[in-house]
């Protein structure tokens, strides 16, 4: 199982989303939509072995975590507007500590970025922090996905911040670099999928 989590520093935390202004008034929700696209959509299929989390820290009521489960997703199209509509529905729910399903395979909860990562760590998942200054990808050995589960941690255009970087170091997350160049989060997801696809 492959799981991804992004800290969305400015992404809105209620359903008041302007679909005509995802990058601006919605707090770079366009970035989040592109990550969902990269996490799940193939040319004529969807990835069922993937879960994607976004933890939104924008106004008015942060944090709100969103969870997308590939094996359950239905009716979502790959374009940003369609994905944003489903995110809007999820954010219209009153978030609590329990995951609430808004539409098939999409959930919201009142959870912190670190809490989800710790939960995955306690489940035995191997945690990777994708960062420009991490160890080169070729220095890591990945087992077959049937033998090992992964969580990949991503930052948005702002990053995750020093405190969360220290937290990841404390829990033993492995810092990995996919490229000598700084990449967009959605591009990183595609590269990770490509690497793990080749292990099947």
UniProtKB/Swiss-Prot annotation:
Protein origin, superkingdom: Archaea
Sites where the protein binds S-adenosyl-L-methionine: 130, 155, 178-183, 188
Pfam family, one: Methyltrn_RNA_2
Keyword Methyltransferase listed: yes
One BP term from GO: tRNA methylation
Keywords, in A-Z order: Cytoplasm, Methyltransferase, S-adenosyl-L-methionine, Transferase, tRNA processing
Catalysis performed (reactions): pseudouridine(54) in tRNA + S-adenosyl-L-methionine = N(1)-methylpseudouridine(54) in tRNA + S-adenosyl-L-homocysteine + H(+)
Gene Ontology CC: one annotated term: cytoplasm
CDD domains for the chain: TrmY-like (cd18087)
Compartment annotation: Cytoplasm
Alphabetized GO MF terms: S-adenosylmethionine-dependent methyltransferase activity; tRNA methyltransferase activity
Enzyme class, broadest EC rank: transferase
Record-listed E.C. numbers: 2.1.1.257
Keyword Ribonucleoprotein in annotation: no
Function: Specifically catalyzes the N1-methylation of pseudouridine at position 54 (Psi54) in tRNAs.
Similarity-based family: Belongs to the methyltransferase superfamily. TrmY family.
Subunit structure as annotated in this protein's UniProt entry: Homodimer.
Descriptive protein name: tRNA (pseudouridine(54)-N(1))-methyltransferase
Species this chain originates from: Methanococcus maripaludis (strain DSM 14266 / JCM 13030 / NBRC 101832 / S2 / LL)
GN (gene name): trmY
